[in-house]
Regions:
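Amphipathic alpha-helical segments enriched in hydrophobic/aromatic residues interleaved with Lys/Arg
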Residues: 99-137
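Short, solvent-exposed loop/turn segments at secondary-structure boundaries
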Residues: 55, 79-80, 102-103
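Generic protein-terminus/edge-of-domain signal
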Residues: 1-59, 65, 72, 99, ...
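Ligand-binding loop in jelly-roll beta-barrel domains
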Residues: 71-99
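Glycine-rich, phosphate-binding/catalytic loops in enzymes
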Residues: 60-61, 83-85, 105-106
Length: 137
């Protein structure tokens, strides 16, 4: 029998995960902001928040995700009546395909939301650091 190799194309190759958190913010939470030399995405699992990317504020609600490129200043604040639950993942990636995500936010499909949930489940089984404490790196 002859075996045929199928070469895999790596459009986006994440080199390292820096942080991965899932937590519930207080209703009146405000984070004044930061910037760093790696990518970060913020996914709203529940609630409504305002997100700053450099000088632009955007409102995100349940199911929305935003990407912050390296060295982009970003901040968040809770703006809804309920405490928001957020997933924050930061990572290093030099893939040119990541340019697609610069200054972009999206509403995820149910299948994509399920994938985010799977990432959290896998992370809880893989990493020893608590995911619900934002200051833990």
């Amino acid at each position: 029998m002859t075996y045929i190799k199928t070469k895999l194309k790596r459009s986006i190759d994440i080199d390292a995960i820096i942080t991965l958190h899932y937590f519930e913010y207080m209703k009146n939470f405000e984070f004044k902001g930061e910037s760093h030399n790696f990518w970060e995405f913020l996914y709203v699992d529940k609630g409504t928040i305002a997100v700053r990317a450099d000088d632009t504020w955007t409102t995100l609600k349940t199911g929305d995700i935003i990407f912050h490129q390296p060295n982009e200043f970003h901040a968040i604040k809770s703006i809804g009546k309920d405490s928001p639950n957020l997933v924050v993942m930061s990572f290093t990636c030099d893939s040119p395909a990541m340019d697609f995500f610069i200054r972009r936010n999206f509403t995820l499909s149910m299948e994509e939301r399920s994938m985010i949930s799977q990432i959290i489940i896998e992370a809880r089984q893989t990493f020893s650091t608590p995911m619900h404490i934002p200051s833990v790196e």
